[in-house]
């Protein structure tokens, strides 16, 4: 499939909730492999529910989507389990790179346009996002 968007996400919150999210992604992957169809849980209402090549690790979950990240799906999952997240995504063929943070029910993101280099550098939104990411990771164990 052309125009994959590679996504990596780290969910942050209560350890049991984060473990439940990791199990959810494992379950999605297993259901998709068994049925050869895409699957999303019923509580996911936003965005495109397309994910493939899901890899669940101790700290990060990685997967592919079509062309763009599916932040709305991540929002629904985070809200359902009461966790926050930090996400990175890239679609090199379209020059799309970005980062997102969801905390306290709000998602902030910065897309980086590689063709004009807009979005990074002196962009205050990018630096604000990096500070928000750092504040979420304070006190987190490296394996989480």
What are the roles of these predicted feature ranges?
Residues 1-144:
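Intrinsic low-complexity, intrinsically disordered or marginally ordered coil/linker segments
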